[in-house]
Amino acid sequence: MNRFAYVEARLSPNESFVSRDNRVKIYDGDQKTDFEDGEVVLTTHRLFWGRPGEIARAAVTLCLPLSYVISVSEETTASNFFGRKTRIIMHLHPPTSDKGPGPLDTSRATHIKLSGKNGLSVEFHSALRETLNARVWEILLTSEIIINGVASSPTLEPANDRLARIQKRTGIGGIERHLEAKAKATDENIALAFQDLSVLMAMAKDMVGVSKTISSKIRKQKGEISDDETVRFKSYLMSLGIDDPVTRDNFTSNSAYFSSLARQICEMLLDPIEEQGGMMSLADVYCRVNRARGLELLSPEDLLHACEQLSGPIRLRSFPSGARVLQLESHDDALIAVDTLEKVEAAESLAVEELAKQLGISLLLAKERLLVAERLGKVCRDESVEGLRFYPNLLLGRD
């Protein structure tokens, strides 16, 4: 990011507009920046990035001279539930001494990334490569040398060839070639869309089942869905996906990767864990997280390492039975025991499966809740041929 400078978004003499794209964010190396959802404009000499409307007003925006660019490459990442999006990686020369002030004075990164909500357009990517190959900023300098009488130098021939190629883009022939390239890009977009559609069709059945399950749960609470429940239903659907999942490729060390992954898991699961009574088994966590990450699936080992680093409102807990859960930090054993005792007293006695059905949790979590209450003396068990049941501990009421 220390190659960018703040300049007014105005074309200089002999500079021409080439292409633009919207909703673009910039990465400083592999790290995210605050420059998101902006408009990027490519000219023959520079690359501009500004907030929506800033470039049109000729306001002060970020500007990267194309002379800094060494090469361009791509990386492909997952896009929400299905499909993939492409990021552009621009490898850069060190900043020159005459560079103006910009967003950063120093940066260890030797490249930047441009990423869109659903990937950058094929047209923009193609225009960027053609512009960098043409190197018009060098051609204009060469033209000045030619005017000054040194056109006979053999070192100028490659630049003249490039100038001729640029000139071929003008006129009726240039317009026809541009329309042909645009039609080809449209065909590629349609082909990619059909690939995404096939993935969507394969997942549609599961998605419809999930939405029906959520809807039926809300309808069981009341006869009709209120406005508050509609908002809650939308929040359920929003929780099904992660816009930009944390991946190992963006980090140079395992500790930074697992720390960032732990923060994302905490943000994603805080509300669902609260709604499930303060605990969620690791099996449920694994399913929820990977369903939300789409194609960027986590291994069980990575998930466990990330959960072990949780230190905020959620923490990893191991029960004496060996079961592991994510539990709210404020949800200690005393609260679990009191809440479980209330459920047992209301029903006079409860089996594990009855408590699981009543709270809408797994059998594993229901059993651990009853065992916690038993260890604290709130309930006592009765094992018989009919199975295991828990009763209120009547000795607590004696003086």
Swiss-Prot record:
Pfam families: EAP30 (PF04157), Vps36_ESCRT-II (PF11605)
Keyword tags: Cytoplasm, mRNA transport, Protein transport, RNA-binding, Transport
Protein name: Vacuolar protein-sorting-associated protein 36
GO molecular function: mRNA 3'-UTR binding; phosphatidylinositol-3-phosphate binding; ubiquitin binding
Major location (coarse): cytoplasm
Job of this protein: Component of the ESCRT-II complex (endosomal sorting complex required for transport II), which is required for multivesicular body (MVB) formation and sorting of endosomal cargo proteins into MVBs. The MVB pathway mediates delivery of transmembrane proteins into the lumen of the lysosome for degradation. The ESCRT-II complex is probably involved in the recruitment of the ESCRT-III complex. ESCRT-II interacts, through the Vps36 subunit, with bicoid mRNA. This interaction is required for the anterior localization of bicoid mRNA in the developing egg.
Deletion consequences: Multivesicular body sorting defects, with large amounts of ubiquitinated proteins detected on endosomes. Bicoid mRNA is mislocalized in developing eggs.
GO BP annotations listed: bicoid mRNA localization; mRNA transport; protein localization; protein transport to vacuole involved in ubiquitin-dependent protein catabolic process via the multivesicular body sorting pathway; regulation of apoptotic process; ubiquitin-dependent protein catabolic process via the multivesicular body sorting pathway
Tissue expression pattern: Ubiquitously expressed in the ovary.
Family listed: Belongs to the VPS36 family.
Gene Ontology cellular-component annotations: cytoplasm; endosome; ESCRT II complex; late endosome membrane; neuronal cell body
Record gene name: Vps36
Occurrences of domain GLUE C-terminal (ranges): 111-144
Domain notes: The GLUE domain (GRAM-like ubiquitin-binding in EAP45) mediates the binding to the 3' UTR of bicoid mRNA.
Subcellular location(s) per record: Cytoplasm
Organism, scientific name: Drosophila melanogaster (Fruit fly)
Source domain of life: Eukaryota
Ranges of residues in domain GLUE N-terminal: 1-94
